């Protein structure tokens, strides 16, 4: 693939789209053959009418298509730009030769994914991926395939897209016409956004005005400052000497066209040379609208989406009488997209159309002929799910009409009588071909539309109105989709160019015929010049009925393809909210009682809209935190510790919820916490991550998830100065594992809850009633949730003895079915590593634990749903198992092992008399199952405090004990006490290590089982995929055989007709010979008749003579002595003789 180059003279004031990698070679498509279309006969035309084709054939075989001669040159469309490789039906971007595999989107660099207009590369359905080192362009087979690829790439770059606030920039623009340009020239425009070329118009010749009428729509744009339209003369190749082809430009600031309303006006063109004429110079009419759509996290739209999904019928019926047609269009568009993505589109359209049927009553001819929400909704749904069907059914036919000069004008007032017969023949041929394309497209008719039409038919049958179901289907499909697409292909993305006058007239006449065919109506007195098509209409009514029956047949729904495009649900919800908020605000301001009653009928919708509007205008601290934190998680891999990001959050006074300790009995606790407490935030993802040594330096966040910030309890702002103290030791995230090391000298362990929460989550304050005066309010983690304020009761002896048996990792169940944890390679945390770390941590525990105490311990256990349960360890003192080395500085990060969480010292909390349990604000949270036995706890505390009862201590001894409680023992005393404690519990630790090893083996076996199950599932999915592929191949083979059978049938019919014609010719020749023989006999008889006539004439004359002679003799009295004898000669003559 090469960089599309534009001649220098065409781009004096803008830069072109960035080039692509030079590693790819251009594969230009063959140029169109410009030979005219020829048709040997009617049946040949019908053979070309089948919709079925494969991508391995060119889209338009101009040597065999129907007769539309004099093709136009396509140079004005491609402008010599290299085209992308032509895709085949069996190829995919996933093939090994695809360039998608060459992209590395996980390096943290900014990546931009945007669609490319077809006028840039001369190829449809392309998109461009731009990154720091260059850019690449890719071509897809359809718009839906392109949209899905773009969305998948964007989610790879920004996995947290749905869970963060974002802005979507959308531009819709029409370049309509220009005036006052030089005549007899061809002109085109280039559309640039911030000096980057995004699209071109086609070339148009100047007449009175230059009319382009082309529409451009761009989504997911970067922030824009200006829209620039450059105008050029289209110089012919033979006249390249004229390099002055630049006309001028129009610059439109985006601020002037920003809003919900379109701005349409004439803009003066700025030319390189000032205009010296009297006129004001050239100008261009442009209609545009630029919108920045602010989209909140999907969580914010939950209630709104539920309301729309459940109450769409009420919403439409209430708003129908009070909103404009433009608002109806936008409302219908948003509702259709939202309900299609939520699976309710069929119910929505069925309910709306049936309400239309009830409203119209006996006047069912008005259905889909009014500007109602139902009409606009079915229009939008047809465009949404039927776009690819429209291209398959009519794309080639429309392109052929554009490229032909065939004249189909049949109005006698607009053409001569000598041309009328030919024009009528042309129109009839085009209508036959168009209808043949449509009725043969049933095999690719969208499944969703079949389901909707079948639902309409069933509802009409239930209501006893089955006679109008056919009218509903034909009116929606033809009146609102196919016929408008034939009349205006550019509005339905079939063609970019607006048709010229002759092509537009041809398309209009074809649409008239097809619409009358769908209505089962003939042409009447209004359009008498179209009456010659009535025979065609009557002949094709049967085919139309069969087509309507086929596309509404529920038995064939599973055999047809479905909608596979992408819908940005967040954007559609934001658009719908903006529209409804504007409408409801206007209604609420009205003084009319009807308008106020309308608002009241909407129920909770105004409040829901107001809440979303408040979130849009005033982002909450939670959203601000999430936005700040998302900056660290914009890519799947995050390097280094996240403690700096968290420290920034806690440096904000409004975000810190830590109380300063007030109670004198807890001053020692306050002091010790400031110096020694370590915090760790657990990742919110439900996926388990593999631990390795690399994880000590780098935390990897799973793709598609957001890290949940810690929940903070609600406190007073005046007590936030300890927030930074708590962060002396930074935080390390590793997967979803948890390790907490905290050293404290307080007396009891606070009750702990575990709250599983779904990602994403942010910090949120707890109920104010949970704040206890003088208590410490530390961070509470998502999984498990630690609260160090409320007292925890003691544990029975039976629970104490078996407490460590219940230890487990805090890892969540991942997508790989890992219940406990996952080990990887050479960095697995084995028990030897664990023992080594335990030995290394002995010196640390000697320095940082309070001697002469047996400290209870609480560790979380993660169940299958991500909830942690607390188990109490009696006589804990696990200093020997601490992981941090003795030289651990305040800036050191904690490390989470791959198998378990280790605590260096136990936690004890001062009991609070009225201390209520803090609860996470989650319905799934549950309390730790620890029984309340305070007496045992007090007894244990008294036993570990001192061999001497505190009541017998002197003031000096009590002071010394207080100092010791603050961790200020001498080094040798600490070591002595620690050694005694270690010796006492060494055997117990060995037992626990054995138990943990056994649990490790069990977990490993579970992991293997889960991997085996996953493999079986993958094999089943692969088998299912192969089965579907086989079914698809069978379907294609069946369709191919059907097509071959149709072709063979047509060929046999043609051969039979030719044979009949030959037989007729033979019969005709034989009859001609018989006729010739008969003619000869007739001629001979005629000659004999003529001779007999002449003989008869002579006979009569002889008789007359004899009669006269005889009469004379009688009168004279002379008797004839010798009578005259009459004799006949041999040749037939008479002779007189006398005796």
From Swiss-Prot:
Residues 149-267 form the C2 domain. Interacts with PEAK1. The record marks 369 as: Arginine finger. The modification Phosphothreonine is found at residue 620. The lineage of its organism: Eukaryota, Metazoa, Chordata, Craniata, Vertebrata. It comes from Homo sapiens. One of its GO terms (cellular component) is cytosol. Residues 41-158 form the PH domain. Residues 45-56 have a biased composition (Basic residues). Residues 17-36, 751-760, 803-818 have a biased composition (Polar residues). The gene is RASAL2. GO terms for biological process: adipose tissue development; gene expression; multicellular organism growth; regulation of protein activation cascade; response to dietary excess; response to glucose; signal transduction. Keywords: GTPase activation, Phosphoprotein. One of its GO terms (molecular function) is GTPase activator activity. This is Ras GTPase-activating protein nGAP. Pfam families: C2, DAB2P_C, PH_RASGAP, RasGAP. Residues 1-87, 684-704, 751-782, 803-869, 910-953, 1116-1139 are annotated as: Disordered. The modification Phosphoserine is found at residues 16, 89, 663, 864. Residues 73-87, 833-855 have a biased composition (Basic and acidic residues). It comes from the Eukaryota. Residues 343-551 form the Ras-GAP domain. Residues 916-928 have a biased composition (Low complexity). Changing residue 379 to D: In a breast cancer sample; somatic mutation. InterPro entries: C2_dom (IPR000008), C2_domain_sf (IPR035892), DAB2P_C (IPR021887), PH_domain (IPR001849), Ras_GTPase (IPR039360), RasGAP_CS (IPR023152), RasGAP_dom (IPR001936), Rho_GTPase_activation_prot (IPR008936). Inhibitory regulator of the Ras-cyclic AMP pathway. CDD domains: C2_SynGAP_like, RasGAP_DAB2IP.
């Amino acid at each position: 693939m090469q960089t599309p180059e534009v001649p220098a003279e065409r781009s004096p004031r803008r830069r072109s789209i960035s080039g692509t990698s030079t590693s790819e070679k251009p594969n230009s498509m063959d140029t169109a053959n410009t030979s005219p279309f020829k048709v040997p006969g009617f049946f040949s035309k019908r053979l070309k009418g089948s919709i079925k084709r494969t991508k391995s054939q060119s889209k338009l075989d101009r040597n065999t298509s129907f007769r539309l001669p004099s093709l136009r040159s396509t140079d004005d469309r491609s402008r010599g730009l290299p085209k992308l490789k032509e895709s085949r039906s069996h190829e995919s971007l996933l093939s090994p030769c695809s360039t998608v595999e060459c992209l590395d989107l996980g390096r943290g660099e900014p990546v931009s994914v945007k669609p490319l207009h077809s006028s840039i590369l001369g190829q449809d359905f392309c998109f461009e991926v731009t990154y720091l080192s260059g850019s690449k362009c890719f071509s897809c087979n359809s718009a839906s395939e392109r949209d899905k690829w773009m969305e998948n790439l964007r989610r790879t770059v920004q996995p947290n897209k749905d869970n963060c606030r974002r802005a979507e920039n959308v531009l819709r623009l029409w370049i309509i016409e220009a005036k006052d340009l030089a005549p007899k020239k061809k002109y085109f425009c280039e559309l640039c956004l911030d000096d980057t070329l995004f699209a071109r118009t086609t070339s148009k010749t100047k007449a009175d005005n230059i009319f382009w009428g082309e529409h451009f729509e761009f989504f997911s744009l970067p922030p824009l400052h200006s829209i620039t339209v450059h105008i050029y003369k289209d110089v012919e190749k033979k006249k390249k000497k004229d390099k002055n082809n630049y006309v001028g430009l129009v610059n439109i600031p985006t601020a002037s066209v920003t809003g919900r309303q379109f701005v349409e006006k004439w803009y003066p063109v700025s030319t390189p040379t000032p205009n010296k004429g009297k006129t004001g110079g050239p100008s261009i009419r442009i209609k545009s609208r630029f919108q920045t759509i602010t989209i909140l996290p999907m969580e914010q739209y939950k209630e709104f989406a539920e309301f729309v999904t459940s109450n769409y019928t009420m919403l439409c019926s209430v708003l129908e009488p009070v909103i404009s047609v433009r608002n109806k269009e936008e409302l219908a568009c948003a509702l259709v997209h939202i309900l299609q993505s939520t699976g309710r589109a069929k119910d929505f359209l069925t309910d709306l159309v049936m309400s239309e049927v009830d409203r119209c009553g006996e006047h069912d001819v008005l259905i889909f002929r009014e500007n109602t929400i139902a009409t606009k909704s079915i229009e939008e749904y047809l465009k949404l799910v039927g776009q690819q069907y429209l291209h398959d059914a009519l794309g080639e036919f429309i392109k052929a009409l554009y490229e032909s000069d065939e004249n189909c004008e049949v109005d006698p007032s607009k053409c001569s009588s000598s041309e009328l017969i030919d024009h009528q023949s042309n129109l009839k041929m085009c209508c036959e071909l168009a209808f043949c394309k449509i009725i043969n497209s049933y095999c690719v008719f969208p499944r969703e539309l079949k389901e909707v039409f079948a639902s309409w038919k069933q509802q009409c049958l239930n209501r006893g109105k089955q006679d109008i179901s056919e009218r509903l289907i034909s009116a929606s499909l033809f009146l609102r989709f196919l016929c408008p697409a034939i009349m205006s292909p550019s509005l339905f993305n079939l063609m970019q160019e607006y048709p010229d006058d002759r092509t537009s007239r041809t398309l209009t006449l074809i649409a008239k015929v097809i619409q009358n065919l769908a209505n089962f109506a003939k042409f009447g007195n209004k359009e008498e010049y179209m009456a010659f098509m009535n025979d065609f209409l009557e002949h094709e009514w049967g085919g139309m009925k069969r087509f309507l029956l086929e596309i509404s047949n529920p038995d064939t729904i599973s055999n047809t393809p479905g909608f596979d495009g992408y819908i940005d649900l967040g954007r559609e919800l934001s658009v719908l909210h903006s529209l409804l908020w504007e409408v409801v605000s206007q209604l609420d301001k009205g003084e009319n009682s009807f308008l106020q009653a309308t608002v009241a009928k909407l129920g909770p919708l105004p409040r829901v809209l107001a809440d979303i509007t408040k979130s849009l205008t005033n982002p909450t601290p939670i959203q601000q935190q999430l936005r700040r934190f998302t900056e660290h998680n914009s890519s799947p891999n995050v390097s280094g510790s996240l403690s700096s990001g968290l420290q920034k959050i806690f440096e904000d006074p409004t975000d810190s919820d830590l109380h300063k300790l007030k109670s004198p009995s807890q001053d020692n606790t306050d002091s010790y916490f400031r110096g020694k407490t370590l915090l760790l935030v657990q990742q919110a993802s439900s996926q388990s991550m593999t631990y390795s040594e690399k994880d000590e330096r780098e935390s990897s966040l799973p793709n598609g998830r957001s890290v949940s910030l810690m929940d903070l309890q609600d406190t007073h702002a005046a007590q936030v100065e300890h927030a930074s103290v708590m962060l002396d030791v930074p935080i390390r995230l590793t997967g979803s594992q948890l390790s907490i090391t905290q050293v404290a000298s307080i007396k009891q362990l606070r009750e702990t809850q575990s709250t599983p929460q779904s990602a994403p989550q942010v910090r949120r304050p707890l109920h104010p009633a949970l704040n206890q005066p003088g208590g410490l309010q530390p961070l509470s983690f998502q999984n498990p949730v630690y609260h160090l304020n409320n007292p925890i009761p003691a544990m029975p002896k039976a629970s104490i003895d078996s407490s460590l048996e219940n230890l487990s990792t805090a890892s969540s169940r991942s997508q790989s079915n890992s219940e406990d944890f996952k080990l990887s390679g050479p960095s697995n945390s084995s028990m030897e590593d664990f023992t080594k770390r335990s030995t290394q941590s002995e010196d640390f525990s000697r320095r940082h634990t309070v001697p002469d105490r047996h400290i209870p311990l609480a560790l979380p256990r993660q169940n299958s749903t991500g909830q942690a349960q607390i188990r109490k360890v009696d006589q804990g003192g696990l200093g020997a198992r601490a992981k941090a080395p003795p030289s651990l500085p305040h800036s050191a990060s904690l490390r989470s092992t791959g198998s378990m969480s280790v605590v260096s010292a136990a936690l004890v909390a001062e009991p609070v008399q009225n201390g209520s349990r803090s609860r996470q604000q989650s319905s799934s949270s549950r309390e730790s199952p620890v029984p309340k036995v305070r007496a045992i706890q007090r007894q244990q505390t008294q036993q570990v405090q001192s061999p001497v009862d505190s009541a017998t201590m002197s003031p000096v001894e009590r002071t010394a004990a207080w100092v010791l409680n603050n961790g200020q023992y001498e080094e040798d005393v600490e070591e002595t006490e620690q050694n005694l404690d270690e010796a006492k519990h060494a055997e117990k630790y060995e037992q626990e290590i054995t138990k943990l090893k056994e649990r490790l083996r069990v977990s490993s076996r579970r992991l293997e089982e889960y991997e085996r199950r996953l493999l079986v599932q993958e094999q089943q999915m692969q088998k299912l995929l192969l089965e579907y592929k086989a079914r698809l191949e069978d379907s294609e083979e069946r369709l191919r055989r059907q097509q071959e059978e149709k072709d063979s049938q047509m060929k046999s019919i043609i051969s039979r007709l030719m044979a009949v014609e030959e037989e007729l010719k033979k019969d005709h020749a034989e009859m001609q010979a018989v006729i010739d023989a008969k003619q000869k006999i007739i001629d001979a008889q005629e000659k004999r008749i003529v001779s007999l006539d002449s003989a008869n004439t002579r006979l009569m004359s002889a008789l007359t003579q004899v009669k006269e002679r005889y009469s004379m003799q009688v009168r004279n009295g002379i008797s004839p002595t010798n009578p005259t004898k009459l004799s006949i000669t041999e040749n037939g003559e008479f002779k007189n003789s006398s005796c």
